[in-house]
Design a protein with these regions (language model features):
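PRPP-associated nucleotide enzymes
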Residues: 1-330
């Protein structure tokens, strides 16, 4: 069931949740829609397509169907990224395991350019699902393979990373490792290309660190540049911050960046407050751990998503009954 909002209701949502629609369409030959977000020191784009909207709005999309749509989206994204001029040098592609392969950008990019694939798996020293706040949660590397850098030409290189970027802490750690390994081999990273579900706060955090190294950023966010909930994990398009409400009973409205036209489409399908990527790795068919493929945890993701949606529904029904009536039954 898709409920449609009137123009006045769309404007009210944009205003109430602080949704940033100050974006400009980039004219491309590629199939994907590309929008540039204004007012950033770095190049920040939104990549949108029917596949992107399905992945963002349907947490029940998992397994082979999820992989198929993700691959189709990546096949549209690569021409857009290249046409936007984001890649000019030899390409180092860093996979942050285990979710990386599920974005499938490398599968399409490798058909267009030679890439040197590096691998790293990180983990928090304490369980981190829906909780990236605790200062004692440090990140460590449990697997690394940078051997492909031995074949990469010395000099300037572009670094491509596909991942879910929430707080940016995991990415920060992974970037530090590969930049260090590249420098040992006479390789200088000039440009960082990011692709995936990306939060604005996490991206700003990465930029504030990476610009000190003189590295440029071209970020390509799937569907929208998201806000980040108070747990530094959930990445909705818009809605109340569910984690803050559950913890402290406080209603805080948050919204991301998206084109006005795209928001009209998404508003009819999206559950306000829903974490768009979910536990992205758990939505995939198989997970590569650096040595072999292992089963994902699809049932765990589905149960968590169901419970999450139930909490959102109860919150909206109590605090925002008019919005609940528009979005219930999805």
């Amino acid at each position: 069931m898709v409920n449609r909002f009137s123009d006045s209701e769309i404007e009210a949502l944009i205003s109430e949740f602080g949704i940033n629609t100050d974006v400009e369409r980039v004219s491309l030959k590629a199939d994907a829609e590309l929008y540039r977000i204004k007012g950033k020191e770095y190049c920040c784009f939104i990549i949108d397509s029917p596949e992107a909207m399905q992945i963002a709005c349907r947490p029940s999309l998992v397994g082979d169907e999820m992989e198929k749509l993700s691959g189709a989206l990546a096949a549209k994204a690569v021409p857009a990224i290249l046409e936007a001029g984001a890649i000019k040098n030899p390409i180092i592609f860093e996979h942050i395991l285990r979710a990386s392969l599920g974005y499938h950008l490398h599968d399409s990019l490798i058909n267009e350019r030679k890439i040197f694939q590096a691998w790293i798996r990180t983990q928090y020293t304490y369980p981190s699902y829906k909780d990236h706040n605790e200062p004692e949660k440090t990140i460590v590397s449990t697997f690394e393979d940078f051997s492909a850098l031995d074949s990469c030409p010395q000099g300037a290189a572009d670094l491509v990373v596909q991942d879910t970027i929430a707080s940016g802490k995991t990415l920060e750690f992974s970037l530090g490792r590969i930049i260090s390994e590249a420098e040992k081999r006479g390789i200088v990273i000039w440009n960082l290309v990011l692709y995936g579900f990306i939060s604005e706060r996490g991206l700003d955090y990465i930029w504030n660190g990476i610009k000190k190294r003189g590295i440029e950023i071209h970020a390509f966010a799937i569907s929208n540049l998201t806000p980040l909930c108070s747990n530094n994990y959930d990445m909705p398009l818009y809605g109340p911050d569910e984690s803050l409400y559950s913890e402290k009973g406080i209603i805080k409205n948050i919204g991301g960046a998206i084109s006005r036209q795209a928001f009209e489409r998404y508003a009819g399908l999206f559950i306000p407050g829903l974490d768009q990527p979910g536990d992205f790795s758990a939505r995939l068919s198989k997970l590569y751990n650096g040595k072999y493929f292992e089963d994902s945890e699809i049932p765990v993701h589905l149960k968590r998503s169901y419970d999450y949606i139930e909490r959102i529904a109860k919150m909206l029904k109590k605090e925002r009954p008019s919005l609940y009536s528009k979005t219930s039954g999805r």
